[in-house]
Amino acid sequence: MCSSDSLQLHNVFVYGSFQDPDVINVMLDRTPEIVSATLPGFQRFRLKGRLYPCIVPSEKGEVHGKVLMGVTSDELENLDAVEGNEYERVTVGIVREDNSEKMAVKTYMWINKADPDMFGEWNFEEWKRLHKKKFIETFKKIMECKKKPQGQGNDDISHVLREDQ
């Protein structure tokens, strides 16, 4: 039985590893339409010892990323589980880079805005070169575990995505 909420579609701004279609395909088991966009009023940071970035509000900041178009509620729950409890899903305004259209979308904001582990600018091209392969292999394992009755907890997900492993 389908509820109307499960049929609702969402647009989600991503700014880290989820910009990569190969990663999204593993996460969602499909590749949705992806458009380039800019998120004003935020800044992206690297996180010490982690393979993924975070964003926090910043008056003069601007983050370039992608919007995943037409994400289902079930897929959004998968993204929520992967992002874990260090991020908060919020609604923000982005500007599409292809047509300058402004849109309200969901994104994941780092909860601890004063986190001492935040530093420097996270670089997508560097991530692809150095970490993409490991990231995809790890997520394939995680998604397989999630399909099993016992599943794998959110804490396990964040621990396997450390730079020092």
Curated annotation (Swiss-Prot):
Induction: Not regulated by chemical or biotic treatments. The active site is at E83 (proton acceptor). InterPro entries: AIG2-like, AIG2-like_dom, GGCT-like, GGCT-like_sf. Its EC number is 2.3.2.-. Keywords: Acyltransferase, Transferase. It comes from the Eukaryota. One of its GO terms (molecular function) is acyltransferase activity. Expressed only in seeds. Substrate binds at Y15, G16, S17, F18, Q19, D20. PANTHER family: AIG2-LIKE PROTEIN A-RELATED, AIG2-LIKE PROTEIN D. Putative gamma-glutamylcyclotransferase. Belongs to the gamma-glutamylcyclotransferase family. This is AIG2-like protein A. The lineage of its organism: Eukaryota, Viridiplantae, Streptophyta, Embryophyta, Tracheophyta.
